[in-house]
Amino acid sequence: MGSAALPHARQRWVSHALDSNRKFLIANAQMENCAIIYCNDGFCEMFGYSRVEVMQRPCTCDFLTGPDTTKSSIAQLTQALLGSEECKLEILYYRKDTSCFRCLVDVVPVKNEDGVVIMFILNFEDLAQLIAKSSGRSLHHRLSQSWRAGEGRRLKFSLPSLRRLKAQRNSLPTSEFDGVAIDYGKPGGDSLILRDLKTSPKENCVQSETESLLEKERRPSLEADPTLQHPIPKQEPPSLGPRGSYSAWGFIRSRPGGSFHSLRRVSSLDNFEAARSEFQRKFRERRANSEGGMGLSGKASHVKPNPPNSTSDSDLMKYRTISQIPQFTLNFVEFNLEKHRSGSTTEIEIIAPHKVTERTQNVTEKVTQVLSLGADVLPEYKLQAPRIHRWTILHYSPFKAVWDWLILLLVIYTAVFTPYSAAFLLNEEQGEEKHWNCSYSCDPLNIIDLIVDIMFIVDIVINFRTTYVNINDEVVSHPGKIAIHYFKGWFLIDMVAAIPFDLLIFRSGSDETTTLIGLLKTARLLRLVRVARKLDRYSEYGAAVLFLLMCTFALIAHWLACIWYAIGNVERPYMEHKIGWLDNLGDQIGKRYNDSDLSSGPSIKDKYVTALYFTFSSLTSVGFGNVSPNTNSEKIFSICVMLIGSLMYASIFGNVSAIIQRLYSGTARYHTQMLRVKEFIRFHQIPNPLRQRLEEYFQHAWSYTNGIDMNAVLKGFPDCLQADICLHLNRTLLQNCKAFRGASKGCLRALAMKFKTTHAPPGDTLVHYGDVLTTLYFISRGSIEILKEDIVVAILGKNDIFGEPISLYARPGKSNADVRALTYCDLHKIQREDLLEVLDMYPAFSDNFWSNLEITFNLRDADSVPRTPLSEEYDCTYRRVRRRKHSLCQPNKPDPDTGTSDAEQYHTYSELTNPQDPLSKDQWDDVGSSTTPCSQTSDDEAKPGSPTKALSLVTASASGTEVSKQAAESSQSYAGTHICTTPLDIPNMFTFWEDQRPNHHPEPLQHVSLVHSSRDIPLHSDYRPGQIESRLELLQAQLSRLESRMSSDINIILQLLQRQLSQVPPAYSPISPSSHNLAMYGIVPRSLEPLTPCAPLEDEQQTAPGQSPSYAEVEKFHLKSRHSLSSGMHLTVASDETMTVYSEQEHHSPPLLNPEPPHQRAPNTQGLLRGSRFPSLPEHLEASSEHQDIQRHLSDPVLPGS
């Protein structure tokens, strides 16, 4: 099965690979030459090739090699592709612009579940970029960890690298330095051993990784560095010293501009310091002789000292440049010379601790600056930020958003507790002693109310400094304008709600004061308008609306409960008979009121719960009657509550039911549609595999579209709005696809209207083998695979195009492979007829579109394009209509099947029509196989027994008269418009009979070649031998039909000539034909010049009775007369050798015109041939129908020359 049987895990791997940022390609190991089936965008950007140019090429990447690419590297790559193990190698590759670079290629085989390699992944890395990235990495973090670990270690350093630190140290700001900088410059064979460095176990784990990285860097660096003059010391295996220590040569990394030096061994710290001073002196001498020094010391010499705490961008860049210079600063504070440990083979950068602190400080300050969005961090090219006054708060700032939600919670608290406090708490009688002796802070609710009042006052102050948006959509930050805007808006309501009335009238315990406080506190409920405005944005969500409606219902019930208690409490002292609901409540719960005891009666809790129960039962129209109104005031209030309840019940709960129905509407539609699908499956008895695919696709499509039919939605809008919507839906394709660049907005709108969107789940087959390619596909998301005989030949991803090149073929072909989705795919597709229709409307954009359209994979099956008799008739009509399209008119375009241009086709025709080189029977079969029966019609008038001769419709010479020029032009334009497919190869038909050979006809040959060049049909197609006989039979039938049609035309011509002969004056008559009124016939006088007929073809054997000389002259006369009548088609039948078309009835019947002897008939014939052939009868207008009938026959599209 090959790679067609990819498991789901591999499909996920392919989809993940398509989204990676690496530069790679995928090749199929089971195809010839391991053809490339996919390359990502990074690969295309690296080498400059498009995906179309890379697909199906061998993965040996021969197109990337150049003159400097070594054959050994190519052989290594080829050997890696023959193996089954991962391999890395370096190759010199060339980009499309001929620039070369060293590339690191990683060949990774992909195996299937059987362990067989089915694919190769080739990952490409620019070696120069890889070295630049790795050289910029710093190892000081790991070294700082090694110092803190306290483990001894012996390190070997590259002396030239250590020597460069002097220049770096001199360029850095001078400060207290607690480390030792060692610089060396003298080459020698000594080495330096530093012992007792502390390292951590973590570093030991990464040594091998670092060594492998340096190994990869070492070779390219040596090749790229022209200054290297010393050989590279080879790495020696570590050997155990006499005291059990290890001695080893380390890698010496080459850097640009540097040189290699050896290391010498020192045994004490004094020798270490002596060596340090010696090399410092030599370095100063070297630096004096050469400005800037060598290598990295030269880079460091021009760096100016920079304060470590600088925070500007330029200073940070300078300091970053300094920090990237390799530093070898050694701290000997924690050295222990008695402990030895085998050192790493890599160079290690050591940075003094206070330098690390400075870097950390700079990074912290930089991060702080970025987080604060300072002006020096913002880009140079930016929008001008609005100028904000000091202490002004932006209305869209996070602080204002949090503050608004806090005020919203306080308003909700006010809406709940203000009515409760005004109704229940303020009417509670307290002892005078407690009331006067206790301060305001005795009641917790008073403390909370005080905090709420303070917050409302602060909110007023903040609103005076908060920006707003004016009617011009401008942010206003001017304090004066903000104040005016706030005064005109919510200031009065906020001010009333923020006044602490209970503090202003505290300690005045009269009843009037208590009632006033309760009424004033209810003014805070005006802030609920802000709550409604704040929560209005959530009105589109059904669940949020449902929650808000329930809260509103509960809040209104709470308010009504407070009012219900206030009515009963106010009326009770004035009633003689205690019949109020509060007295009834006391009797029911056993807590009767006692006028002498103010604390008697039900508690506040009992009163509130009972009042709330009554209001809820009244609002919901339940009303059990256990709490009933008894007084008139209570009854009136109950009526009001019932009215409010009916309205609220109808609005709120009706809205709730609608919301619930809307929430479940999608589910209901899903179940309804799913039921239809199941009924369809059951009714048609769909098999289980297909049934499962159908159900899975329906479920996924529903989750993707939620059951919304976009076509049904778009049909409800006008065309202009539909075009805008389609343009928005296809904007990504139209903007990113190269083929649509340069299109006008009207063209894009027309194309967007024709595009359809398709969604395909994994495993769904989009195109099957043999399907007619009537659609062009554009992939916008996901990946697909193309399979030929269950072998993956290509993997396409985002922005790829597959189908067939419509501009090269006038008739849709058939698919040569299966197209299957690997992941969930979104595709845009357009029908070829719709695309051609739009391009015909915009011919200026058509050429640009065809030139920029790059089809990633051509699905057209070029080997076999089956044709059926029914499809041929359709093909004729299709080509005839499509020939009028300007979008397909591309001159000198190579033939799609043969790859030949018009000039090559003309040369081919010249060879085929050369009489000196007649075609054999086999050659004729080959030529005939390229012709199609497209030109045959539905009316079958052929006579099987009629003789068939060679046919040649020859275009008359255009050198005679202007009429002949006009006729030739009209004939050529007519032929270019109506001939739809490859016609009978007329000039080559003479070679079908070996006894006949045509003469040279250069002008007709040129006309035929032009006709062929104006079509987009291949001249030669590869047909099987079995089809040649059918082609010959169709050719025979075609000639028979042409013969019968021409016979009927000749009969009409002869009838007309009989009427003309009676009016045309004889040759000896003094009347000149020019005396006729030319305007009556609508013919220009300049057309009176005689027409020179084509010379008759010589026939070797004249055995047919109709081919006698007398008959030939009469036939020539008849056909010459026909030329005068054929104003629409300027065709001339030369002679009987050229064309002898007559029926058996005509052959056996007497001639219509009695032939005269040649000497008597010659003058008449000459007069007819040389004179102007005008219809002599003024009644020629009555015979217009006959002319039209002739034109109708001649304009029949079945004639190959027309």
Swiss-Prot record:
Ranges for region Disordered: 203-243, 285-315, 912-948, 1092-1112, 1140-1202
Topological type in the membrane: Multi-pass membrane protein
One GO term describing the cellular component: monoatomic ion channel complex
Record bears the keyword Ribonucleoprotein: no
Residue span(s) of domain PAC: 87-139
Start and end residues of each stretch annotated as cNMP-binding domain: 739-839
Reactions that this protein is recorded to catalyse: K(+)(in) = K(+)(out)
Topological domains annotated Extracellular: 427-443, 507-515, 565-608, 630-635
Function: Pore-forming (alpha) subunit of voltage-gated inwardly rectifying potassium channel. Characterized by unusual gating kinetics by producing relatively small outward currents during membrane depolarization and large inward currents during subsequent repolarization which reflect a rapid inactivation during depolarization and quick recovery from inactivation but slow deactivation (closing) during repolarization. Activates even more slowly than KCNH2.
Entry-linked PANTHER family: POTASSIUM VOLTAGE-GATED CHANNEL SUBFAMILY H MEMBER 6, VOLTAGE AND LIGAND GATED POTASSIUM CHANNEL
Protein name: Voltage-gated inwardly rectifying potassium channel KCNH6
Record organism: Gallus gallus
Gene name of the record: KCNH6
